[in-house]
Design a protein with these regions (language model features):
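Ligand-binding cleft/hinge of the Venus flytrap
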Residues: 338-347, 424-425, 437-439, 443-466
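Short, glycine/charged-enriched hinge/interface segments at domain edges or termini
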Residues: 1-139, 275-280, 311-317
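Flexible glycine/proline-rich
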Residues: 58, 181-323
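Helix-rich terminal scaffold detector
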Residues: 87-212, 216-221, 342-347, 374-378, ...
């Protein structure tokens, strides 16, 4: 069919109004131009084709957005298209953040004994922005009742919400409760959650005030579970943005039935199911928040969960990120952090490690709760490392033992070695305070082997029963002066600027089911640890021999 311009058709551009005498639009790409003013259509056209009817999008009187709706980018377009150029909104609340404590100093200031770098207020400010508020961080308020009262009084007259950090417990210089009582009213002091129990909820000059505990993890959970809801409430909405997955617990968790407890976990996706491995639970362990992939909430009425229980975990990452995570449960070493960093640099996959000791790693491998385990287990009968333990604990599964590094274990002591400790015998002779690794760790097994060989009774060592879960934690206790010696790897001593007395060389290896060697994430991890970049980082740390790195031994 041929059409003549001005008779059968007119030319319009996208978005133009259609003249009343026309009722169909044919796209230019569906036409054959016979001449400058004549076209031929190549397929049938029907009435109202390619025409947007008046009222198809928005008509007068139509509800565009309901009350208490959070305006999204797409909503702005709908409002303007509907002729609505102004709307009444809830204002973003102005939030005053007041850090308190004589012991606090600003980042970058010179530190003296007893000083603590103040960082909670900066975390709060970022969280408040994320929740939709406008944060203002005050200068550190020292532990002076009158001065703190004046600061809080002024803030309550200028801001919508006040966050008072630290001083919510019952110590001699914990003034938060007294200040709030003097200026206003305390509704609640202490709630049944852990961490975060000492929180204070009150009002000053009819403004809500929250006294937040000083411990970083406690503070984080109060912000997430109370302050976030408060900021949402004053803005007229309640965002339920927690995302949950069902996961299997890799170990037993005990909890007090007095509190709702928040437990940080590592997550992995193994053989079609999610695995949750609990990590540090202390209220002051800031890195547990950084390292966590999710949070398990243990209800107040429960005393915990058994290993293997299916639980709901609030995830802090996307499910895709978790499914692209390689989970390592086993013995700790700093080189795992280096490998994790280099793997993340490549893009798709990440390495997530939980430190439970070598035996704990093998048991997780046996129960199909980890992709691989890092182990350094000495067979005291043969002097061989790792192979016999894999055979003993996992007899019915083909396991590959990947040679990782040989490393030096030794005594870590204060710089300058003030007690002149040169052997394990000196620990006993000089009454040195020892800090140990946990039962089931390869370092603990090595220590017990050496003590037995030397005829030393563990009961004669002061601190033998005092346990830490990583080499760096042992080194930190010595560096702080809380212990005189501990057994660990050279790299940990170097990082904490300690002296090091070598005791033994050991094999730190990777045990992995043979079928997992075909996983893309595992292949990329193996590429990382065999790379020159990784080996260069080992050289910088010192104390590692990687001459056999990457060699695979199949154990059946």
């Amino acid at each position: 069919v041929r059409l003549k311009e001005g008779v059968d058709y007119v030319v319009v551009d996208t978005g133009d109004p259609i003249p009343d005498e026309y009722d169909c639009v044919i796209m230019a790409e569906d036409l054959i131009w016979v001449s400058q003013d004549e076209v031929e259509i190549i397929k049938p056209a029907i009435p109202w084709q390619n025409i947007r009817q008046i009222g198809e999008d928005i008509v007068e009187g139509q509800l565009i957005l309901p009350q208490s709706h959070r305006i999204r980018p797409a909503d702005i377009g709908a409002l303007i298209a509907g002729g609505v150029f102004e709307v009444e909104v809830y204002k973003k609340p102005k939030v005053a953040i007041i850090p308190t404590g004589t012991e606090l100093v600003e980042p970058g200031e010179e530190l003296k004994v007893g000083d603590i770098i103040e960082f909670n207020s900066r975390v709060f400010a970022a969280q408040v922005e994320e929740y939709g508020g406008i944060p203002t961080r005050f200068d550190i308020a020292k532990d002076d009742f009158e001065k703190l009262k004046a600061v809080v009084d002024k803030a309550s007259k200028e801001y919508d919400i006040i966050l008072l950090n630290a001083g919510s417990s019952a110590g001699r210089e914990d003034y938060s409760k007294k200040v709030i009582e003097t200026l206003g009213e305390v509704y609640i002091h202490g709630i049944a959650i852990k961490p975060g129990k000492p929180v204070i909820l009150g009002k000053v000059n009819n403004k809500p005030i929250v006294g937040i505990p000083g411990f970083p993890v406690s503070a984080y959970f109060i912000m997430e579970n109370i302050v976030k809801k408060l900021i949402n409430f004053v803005q007229g909405y309640d965002i339920k943005d927690k995302r949950y997955i069902e996961a299997t617990l890799s170990k037993r968790i005990m909890s007090s039935s007095k509190y709702l407890e928040f437990v940080r976990v590592k997550l992995g996706f193994i053989d079609g199911k999610y695995i949750a491995a609990p990590i540090e639970r202390g209220a002051g362990t800031t890195m547990s928040l950084v390292r966590a992939d999710g949070v398990l909430e243990i209800p107040e009425e429960l005393e915990g969960y058994e290993k293997g229980t299916r639980v709901n975990v609030n995830i802090l990452k996307s499910e895709d990120e978790i499914k692209n995570t390689i989970l390592c449960i086993g013995s700790h070493d700093l080189i795992l952090d280096i490998a994790a960093d280099l793997l993340a640099k490549r893009g798709k996959f990440t390495l997530s490690s939980a430190h439970v000791g070598s035996i704990g790693g093998i048991l997780s491998l046996k129960d199909r709760e980890t992709h691989f385990a890092t182990i350094h287990l000495l067979d005291v009968e043969t002097g061989e490392y790792n192979k016999s333990y894999v055979k003993r604990y996992i007899p019915n599964r083909k396991i590959a033992l990947i040679k990782f590094v040989k490393r030096i274990q030794g005594l870590m002591v204060k710089k300058g070695n003030p007690l002149e400790i040169n052997s394990l015998e000196d620990i006993v002779k000089k009454g040195a305070r020892f800090v140990n690794r946990q039962k089931g760790s390869g370092t603990r097994i090595l220590l017990d082997y050496e003590l037995k060989r030397l005829g030393i009774n563990p009961k004669d060592i002061i601190g033998y029963d005092r346990e830490e879960y990583t080499h760096i934690s042992v080194a930190a206790q010595i560096a702080k002066g809380n212990a005189d010696a501990g057994l660990g790897v050279f790299s940990a001593a170097k990082i904490m600027d300690l002296d090091f007395i070598p005791i033994a060389n050991e094999d730190y290896d990777i045990a992995i089911p043979v079928e997992y060697l075909e996983l893309d994430g595992v292949k990329q991890f193996l590429e990382v640890i065999n790379s020159e970049e990784f080996k260069n980082e080992l050289d910088k740390l010192g104390g590692y021999d990687y001459s056999n790195l990457g060699e695979i031994i199949i154990i059946e």
